[in-house]
Amino acid sequence: MPQTFAPLTTTREERGKAITEKKGQIWRYSNGMYRVMSQSGNGSYQVKKTDLGWKCTCPDHQIRGVECKHIIAVKLSFALREEVRANVTLDPVVITNCPACGTANIQKFGIRHNKNTDIQRYICLDCGKQFSINIGFEKMKHNPKAITAAMQLYFSGESLRNTQRSLKLLGAEVSHQTISNWITKYTMLMKGYVDKIGPNVGDVWRADEIYIKIKGNMKYLFALIDDETRYWIAQEVADSKHMHDAAGLLHEGKQLMDKIPAVLVTDGLPSYHTAFNKEFYSNVKPQSRHINAIKLTGNEWNENNNKMERINGEIRDREKTMRGLKKKSTSILKGMQVYHNFIKPHEGLDGRTPAEACGIQVNGENKWMTLIQNAAQAK
């Protein structure tokens, strides 16, 4: 029986598409500057958008003057990124179709009364299907408004006990442990979802560390933010400040943002420079720069690191209410990150959230509800 072979990928278009389908092959320095990894394992090439079109430093483009696979890959990636940016609008999920037959010919059909909440029921006028949809809050005993109110109260500064008392005034009898369970469940749901959304962050990032208590022991929270939009990019908790390898923080930021910053601003911690050289530095120009702000005075980068200190202040205030964290892998810090990026408006951004400054619009009066519904629907 004759052997059959898979067809070879021969055209530049196919090779370019193959590059985009592999993770970590294209790194964006800015909107018009990219680095594409060599597919033969020999370093990388610079792809740049100019007034005369796209240019690449690879031999195929330099010698033949053709649109190489690296340019094609960047253009495909660029088009996809622009399409995603243009459509990153999260709206509240509204029931419009029957889950059985798909028709839009539905109408409300009474209320289902549970012990702690009421759920709207619907009927399909075509197939007769009766249904209720509670996206993101299925099998939950309490009203979604009570759950999201608890998250708003907690992340805006209230303790679990005070949140419990506030909910009681609203008619929701719930234990502080149940509230803690809600926070864990929905924080992880939202964080997993928003990490897949590509925020349009700037090209200057800042990293800093702050000490926190976990089970009474001193730990350090390392955080990475975008200077322009205040978007909190990444975080990690370390046992030590000076012995910690910050490469994990920078690597996570690079992976989530799908780019390398033009400038990284940090304090004088040596591990930052080591991590920068490992994760961000390249011989390909334009090279990313590491600015040690603590050594600079009267400098454009050294604004006393105020933008970073604001996040540190938020964490400090939150930690006082929590009286310390219980475990290193706590979801609370991730919840604070979601709250900071998507819920809390910032005066320095003219009342917008960092996510809105990055082109991600979360609509609806209850943004917690919108995020949870969209995250649940995307699973």
Roles of regions detected by a PLM:
Residues 1-123, 169:
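Long, low-complexity, compositionally biased intrinsically disordered regions
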Residues 44, 217-223:
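Short glycine-rich loop/turn motifs
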Residues 116, 120-204, 209-216, 229:
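Short, positively charged, Gly/Tyr-enriched micro-motifs
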Residues 117, 292-316:
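RNase H-like two-metal-ion nuclease catalytic core shared by retroviral integrases
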Residues 140-142, 235-257:
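Active-site beta-loop-alpha junctions of metal-dependent nucleic acid enzymes
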Residues 260-272:
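Acidic/histidine-rich, metal-coordinating catalytic segments
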Residues 317-379:
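C-terminal domain-tail junction helix/linker
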